[in-house]
């Protein structure tokens, strides 16, 4: 039997139980106190008759309870399904139904959606962020393999939300490979857990590395405001900040409000979106810390490549492959290309999923002969450093989140007043890009941009909603900024 995550986590945290492990709202929890919370969560789930192979959806922010429930579910041989609780209601329901969960657990910040979810036949319960609630009456959900640790929902290589099931071995291999690749992570480090854990990158870099290595973490429900977060980093001697470029931009912006440097911070880990090259220089000059950039996908347990430590940073490059990943660059015929040549990036390895969860059509399309088609155009230099050239799919990156133009266009085109629509990304310094829609109305029809935006808000996640709508007589044949 392969080693499971909860075994390693429990063994490491049980050593030196009085050592600090988790800081939440200015209070440090010891390893022992956190394990006691895990035990309480496990007892509640046993009382709820939760069975091995079943799944529980967590609609929770980063918090002690989200971490403890995750470990408790694993201890009972179950699967965690983190859901973006900020997403559109219709998307939440689709994901919960698709995953066939035993129950959903959320918090007071989302108490308005709990009864709506329950009305769809999925029991939804409210918990505090520091203690488990009462036993829950789950549904007779499908029981599957206990090997699946987490099921993430991602836009991935198409605009439609789909599920990626990652096993314990997938996540353990990427966690250990990241630690090995960076080379200087020790028990003296303190991580900032501020990236949303319903995202694979946040889950691995913010939570899992800390849990597996028993590294102290400062857990934040929200990264905002950035100035407050920076002060928390200083006060708690945080050494590593996992982030997306939007978060880095916000920190740099807050620096104009008079941020003092912190001597404890070693570096910022950046992923989830392309990092503007000037950020590296500005971060060193203004905040006094380097940025270690990487590349990854949910299908590869969030990380494929990383700069090999501070000395291995090469501006414009996305580091070298982790030891758990193999890759090849291929042309349109499938022929493997040498270093320096651009082509489609394929990957495989211990950290790469074997399929899309309950989606045989997409599995057949993107998982071919043991390799995963990333749909990214890339190249490696002679030293093995990765560069992304472009994407084979039309993707807009908003604050580290993928937005597919076709998905937004489909929602807008459903309105009877709309004849044609084209959606693009418009560059913005903070979010990377924002969504803009060009719309041709049918003759004699009228609708305002405000009305269309309100329609989009009801059907799309917040980051997919167009910020700009321009009515035109004819669609542009090229991108207009």
Q: At which residue positions do the language-model features occur?
A:
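Conserved pre-ATP/AMP-binding loop-to-beta segment of ANL
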Residues: 2, 18-20, 135-153, 159-160, ...
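Conserved AMP-binding A3 loop
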Residues: 30-32, 149-176
